[in-house]
From Swiss-Prot:
Topological domains annotated Extracellular: 32-713
Cytoplasmic side of membrane: 1-10
Protein name: Probable glutamate carboxypeptidase VP8
Family to which this protein belongs: Belongs to the peptidase M28 family. M28B subfamily.
Amino acid sequence: MPHSVLARLPPGSVRLVAAFGLLLLVSLLVLHRRPGRPHVAAAAASDRLTDPSRSRLFLSQSPGANASIAADLRALTAGPHLAGTPASAGAAAHVLARLRAAGLQTLTREYEPLLSYPGHASLALLRPDGSLLARLSLEEPADEGRRVVPPYHAYAPSGGAVAEAVFVNLGREEDYVVLERLGVGVRGRVAVARRGGGYRGGVVARAADKGAVAVLIAGNADGGVERGVVLLGGPGDPLTPGWAATSGAERLKFDDKAVKQRFPSIPSMPVSAKTAAAIIRSLGGPAIPAEWKDGLGVDTGGLGPGPTLVNFTYQEDRKFYKIRDIFGIIKGQEEPDRYVILGNHRDAWTYGAVDPNSGTAALLDIARRLGIMLQSGWKPRRSIILCSWDGEEFGMIGSTEWVEDNLEDLHSKAVAYLNVDCAVQGVGFFAGSTPQLDKLLVDITRQVRDPDVTGKMVHDTWNEMSGGIKIERLARTDSDFAPFLHHAGIPSVDLYYGEEFPGYHTALDTYNWMEKHGDPFFLRHLAITEIWGLLALRLANDPVLPFDYQAYTSQLQEHIKTLSALTSNGHAVNLMNGCVNDLSGAAMEVLKEMKKLQQMDLYDEHARMRRRLLNDRLLLAERSFLQPEGLQGRGWFKHLLYSPPEDYESKLSFFPGIADAISRSANLSDKEQEVAMQHEVWKVCRAIQRAASVLRGEFSEQKPTNFSSLVTP
């Protein structure tokens, strides 16, 4: 692989890259790639195994692989390995050694971001006169050996409070509406919330907006206390937004407006269910609504405020630490400058058996299998990069810094990013993807045996469990696909077994739990490994990329239907339907072109050039959905279809700019809301039209479409 994939490159225009890339490709192919034996030989080497043969060879290595996966997971989870600690460096060494043992070329990239660790913390209940009533534990009952980092919220500011407490349920807007109706306010008080109200940083931010002076978030009643990050405004190092946090890089000051917006304004802390219950039992005020008691384990107490006081102090320790991303690389034989990227993070809040090292063990088994295939003489058509990220638990830092470090290279060369974080956390297969990868994903699950039902394939049980195949869209920011999709516009997939895990981010996330409860025979690990690896093989080897933009248009049409139910702005809906129809036409044309090329001689030079150009259009179309300046007020997020909305409680999980406009204008008249939405609607429409033009391989100005009639009252 060219070293440039890991080189630092200056940021630039997405559209300029796309146009320049296409022109450069045409020039290189026409001027330099004349028919000749070397090119035929390279193509023959990469295509020596047909797709069924490649799949069979990959799957033939499954017997006994579950034992290998289990051994890697046991080694990785022998102790806690939080990013920035010596133990984390040990986990990195294990991954590096296993990639090298598989015969892959390896690279390591270091970054030096700002990380946050806990210092001193204390919590006590006081009587109304200020005398001590009880000291409350901030430790985790499940952590008997006291080996893991104490529960804390990364990047929560140092501070303290002596104030009355209020129970705010999940800390959502609707919960504060209930409190207001009951005459309970949180201004100047400590908000006590229970887990389940969405992103913890959003829960803290909403409490601060309501005037709270501190927030305590209760864990589940099983003894675990959920650690986590509370930064706002997107992933990555908070002091280097948009560029890599390399040693000696420019760093913004803490008083910079962009930095201050990312850090919470009040201290917060995760606490055990037992500690939260002790506080709630001491509260008076209105009775707790019955539906708010779920999982609390309290039968007395009220919503507050008071009469007892909470005395809470917290001291944060912020430092710059080195983190290490590790890469295993297989250089493509025919198209080495096209990258199929598989990623999983390596760092963990505690032992990490589920999050993330179930995925790490699967990644290492893929490396082992690909190494055996290389020894057999196989080489992929395109390059395959296996990525082991560091610093994910602090806000996807390792992956984000690498994407920012290599943005131009990725814009022009990345085919897709395939993510696995918590590979196995329970029963049932779940997946998210950008829509053009849906069909490929579904097809792959027809090739993999279901780990829980004998005689069935994953596709069968997935379909039965969900009442039809359901694929999530990746607008959330809780794993490493976020920088690839939301910032770089790279088609992405996320895979996992099990919807929820009670030990998430707690000391319960151990190898022992996995062996006893999560996946005793490691067969779900095996299924994820096979799906993940087969996806990579198809994307790295199919002569024509298996992208289906008809599925994208169908999904956009569904999104528009959902939007139309939330707004009375019929003009906006009509406008968007017109743009999607244009994309649908382009997708149909591409589908016909794909079928023609699939019938042509694989080694014909003219056909090879046409395939290359078509593939470039297919991979660049997703970049068309990027807005170079980003979303309003949130410039790091650039994807106009699938970035997270500003309001984490928004009813829209797509069209984030439109979702933000709706949220910001919620208290305005219908006419004012329409005006607020209109500009964001046009942005989305222009992006969809750009994608249609890219798919057709033409300048957008060549076929201007008149949509004025659609928006004329």
